[in-house]
């Protein structure tokens, strides 16, 4: 019975150490991370807007 108790204690220590090393996946860096761009075409539309607002010598190609 003594060997089983020691084995259970060692297993519990190893599991708790693994949890401490890996963490609980709720890190401050994750919470404060910059959100990914939910509108990926925004840069292209901004460029097209600039091209449209600029004075273009060829009106048909400027949109």
Swiss-Prot record:
Residues 24-52 form a propeptide. GO terms for cellular component: extracellular region. Keywords: Amidation, D-amino acid, Disulfide bond, Gamma-carboxyglutamic acid, Ion channel impairing toxin, Neurotoxin, Secreted, Signal, Toxin. It comes from the Eukaryota. It holds the Pfam family Conotoxin. Expressed by the venom duct. The modification Cysteine amide is found at residue 62. The modification D-tryptophan is found at residue 58. Disulfide bonds join 56-62. It is found in: Secreted. Residues 1-23 form the signal peptide. Belongs to the O2 superfamily. Contryphan family. The cysteine framework is C-C. Its target is unknown, but this toxin may modulate voltage-activated calcium channels (Cav) or calcium-dependent potassium channels (KCa). This is Contryphan-Ar2.
